[in-house]
Amino acid sequence: MTQDELFKVLVAHCKEYGFIFPSSEIYDGLAAVYDYGQMGVELKNNIKRYWWESMTRLHENVVGIDSCIFMHPKTWVASGHVAAFNDPLIDNKDSKKRYRADNLIEDYLGKIEEKIEKEVAKGRKKFGDSFDEAKFRETNPNILREKAKYEAVHNRYVAAEQANDLKEYKQIILDCGIVDPISGTANWTDVRQFNLMFSTQISNTGDADDKIYLRPETAQGIFVEYLNVQKTGRMKIPFGIAQIGKAFRNEIVARQFIFRMREFEQMEMEFFCRPGTEMEFFKYWKETRMKWHVNLGMGAENYRFHDHEKLAHYANAATDIEFNFPFGFKELEGIHSRTDFDLGNHSKLSGKKIQYFDPETGESYVPYCVETSIGVDRMFLAVLSHSYKVEDLENGESRVVLSIPAPLAPVKVAILPLLKKDGLPELAQEVVNEIRYDFNYQYDEKDSIGKRYRRQDAIGTPFCVTVDHDSLKDHCVTVRDRDTMEQVRVPISELRAMIDKKVNMSNLLRGIEG
């Protein structure tokens, strides 16, 4: 199965099993807007809980808030979003489709990287154990040719980004022979800037002065509440403020399922520190956030850092944690050193003094800030895309299984009476009563036990508990493990402790520091 095929199958699986639905589907849906179903909302909430508790419980100096979506419009003037929150837009005249010019160039560069890696893979296969990858990359003529092409285009692209040269964007697209994937032509319009903020009116007068925005990020809610949190919480520098919430961006091209949407959810933390110490904390949060991801057990090889060559207007250092999605390595989380840009600008525009008096140094200053920002929806997609597997079984059949990290699984345990008679459902209900206050569970007595196992595999349930006739005699049940399919007999009295050991969020959190 190719990566494209896997992605299509995954999207269909999400709908079939209640993870994600196209929003307003009875009205033919709305492009790039999705609803989370009964399984999806549980997984999403577990992801958010893992992040929230890792921030606010594992760090004594990080606290949380929940700010509003609507904020005073001057907030977005101070943050720079009104003037500079734009993407470069280009249209194909033949297909009438719209694209981000920078994405077209980045996809072109990505294809060159793929060619290089395929050449390396061929060399590895040809030379076996004697393969010297470093030397091969330095001497292979095909790789050297592709590297030279990559560097030439990449250097032009970086220069165009830094200069905000829209004409050069288009010229790179033309020089590289980049064509529209639908029409196959290079009949492009000029590149122009497109502001990504949604706006509305706060009253019914329609007056331009009533214009407000749907927040494009949650971070500004933290910055404008900095003084309130610092004073009421008696917080000492360094400290952080965490928040989970919805944000909205009028994306030019919303694509790749829930990877890029117009309405999405962010998990952001702003860490305030003394000027001059920000790079120390930038390094700390860079390492800490990578540990958080790798701790889920989805393979360290599926993550990588990508340091920014072009920095945002507010940053003096920035890196992305990229994940290997079905469509390649893409940004999952950003870590940025934002300096004092935000607090400083809000102080100037509001006329309010936003400073911190440091009792250790006896000086007052505007704190610097290091930010970690991750999309809940992208994290959801990372977990699902890595977890989805089709396995061949010894009997010649196959099964679809979601090997979701157990603490994140929507349903932790399924209680399955072998038959709907002989007192088995009644005993199964007793088992339910043993675990219902501790775990999200499903009770299922319909169809054969094999079909019920497959249904639970498909939604990622770590344990299936079967109540059979022997259970009536020995008060034990058969517990089936999702990943190994191994089955063991366990006394009902010990069932809760056995399940808890694997699915408890606390054990997952301990792994970050272990």
Where are these regions (language model features)?
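NTP/phosphate- and nucleic-acid-binding module
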Residues: M1-G514
